[in-house]
Amino acid sequence: MAGGTSFYFAHAIRQLPPAVSFRLITKVGSDALPEVERLRTAGVDVTCYPSEHTVYFENKYGTDANRRTQRVLAKADPFTIEELQDAEARIFHLGSLLNDDFSPETVRHLASRGRISIDVQGFLREVRRMEVYPTDWRNKEEVLGLTDILKLNEHEMTDISGLHDPRTVARQLAEYGVREVVITLGSYGSLIYAEGRFYEIPAYKPTAIIDTTGCGDTYSAGYLYSRSQGIGYEASGKFAAAMCTLKLEHNGPFDRTIEEIRRTII
């Protein structure tokens, strides 16, 4: 089935009122072109570059819904500066799936044209014989110095820092130059660190946990949708958390309304 940051983020954004503009830039093999057309039919503005393969993940979940094992059965080609030469945005959200999707030079080019938002997950994934292993971030200091907004979960924060306390990790990442550090903590909520202050965001209880895949991307969509409108850190975090709760309650990407999001926020 289709998935990944581009899929879950795009579907989440399209469910929200068009208060901000959004364009998806993706890179897929010919096998995924029908899915690109479905996104376009759904109203998503998509720029698609050709790749020899489409990245193909296999996810397996156990009894702990916050943990999964992964394999990568195919990899897409990295993005290039030439492909992104004319890209324009106030915020570029880099939803990397693997650690070679974006070179530091490509990130630097985009940073010269807008603010950089990064979901750290892909930068910490290395593929060896189809198996996915956590790895240290290549050129971490260089890329973090270009990053305005960084999102990571409770496992990724340990992979990137070797530490287990989210507040300590957030402060450390801010020292690299990251302006907004967003750490999601699964059923324990999330933590935002910005301008020297912490914001604790609750996790709203879902009626049922049906599908956790894509929750991180859904959170990013809600957070950036709110922040790009000038909404504050705490309110943006609560909006994003409510979207995650609604996403958990069904299979597939986020498909609810802004009214349902507002009713979920306590």
Language model regions located:
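Short catalytic helix/loop segments, enriched in acidic residues and glycine
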Residues: M1-I13
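Alpha-helix C-terminal capping segments
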Residues: H11-S21, S226-Q229
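Short, conserved phosphate/pyrophosphate- and ester-handling motifs at nucleotide-, phospho-/glycolipid
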Residues: I13, N153, G216
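Conserved N-terminal subdomain of the carbohydrate kinase-like
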Residues: Q15-G95, D100, E105-R115, T264-I266
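Short, charged, surface-exposed secondary-structure boundary motifs
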Residues: V55-K60, R125-M130, I209-T213
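Structural detector of well-ordered beta-strand residues that form the stable sheet scaffold
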Residues: I116-D119, V182
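Conserved phosphate/ATP/ADP-binding segment of small-molecule kinases
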Residues: R125-F198
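Conserved post-catalytic alpha-helical subdomain immediately downstream of the catalytic base
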Residues: Y204-I265
